[in-house]
Amino acid sequence: MGKANKKAKAPSATIAQNRKARHEYHLEEHFEAGLVLEGWEVKSLRAGKGNLTEAYVLLKNGEAFLFGARFEPLNTASTHVNPDPTRTRKLLLHRRELGRVFGGVQKDGFTCVPVSLYWKKGFAKCDIALAKGKQKFDKRATEKERDWNRQKQRVLRQR
């Protein structure tokens, strides 16, 4: 009886998140970018071995590239391929999106940061955002607000 009512839990579509980016920047405008990956990288992402902590987006010659993202190779990866965990990966964006990103970075002083990696219809996607850096007092204010909201939720749950 108990087994029939339980549903199998679907795997999460999110592979990795860049929490550091959410803490250090005001995220303004988000874009969904595809990634040019090798076979071993897709396998390691399926195993959840992606890391965006030190990653950033570099705009060069009308193209966007993901630098510093670590995709740890699996032990069972191919022997004839030499995997490089921190290689530069090209981001795939539409021409208009690239124009908006370039304009935001060059004219408006935004920074382009990767926010998360996720699966969409079997393809690995990277959520990138145009962001402004937070000052120290902004970070403190965000932390205080988060703590205050947690305290409010605790009080409401106890009633």
From Swiss-Prot:
Record keywords, A-Z: Cytoplasm, RNA-binding
Gene Ontology BP annotations: trans-translation
Any one of the GO CC terms: cytosol
CDD domains cross-referenced by the UniProt entry: SmpB
Keyword flag RNA-binding: yes
InterPro entries: SmpB, SsrA-bd_prot, SsrA-bd_prot_CS
GO MF term set: RNA binding
Pfam families from the UniProt entry: SmpB (PF01668)
Subcellular location: Cytoplasm
Gene3D superfamilies for this protein: 2.40.280.10
Bias type Basic and acidic residues, positions: 140-150
Region (Disordered): 140-159
Family designation: Belongs to the SmpB family.
UniProt xrefs under NCBIfam families: PRK05422.1, smpB
Function comment: Required for rescue of stalled ribosomes mediated by trans-translation. Binds to transfer-messenger RNA (tmRNA), required for stable association of tmRNA with ribosomes. tmRNA and SmpB together mimic tRNA shape, replacing the anticodon stem-loop with SmpB. tmRNA is encoded by the ssrA gene; the 2 termini fold to resemble tRNA(Ala) and it encodes a 'tag peptide', a short internal open reading frame. During trans-translation Ala-aminoacylated tmRNA acts like a tRNA, entering the A-site of stalled ribosomes, displacing the stalled mRNA.
Name assigned to this protein: SsrA-binding protein
Gene that specifies this protein: smpB
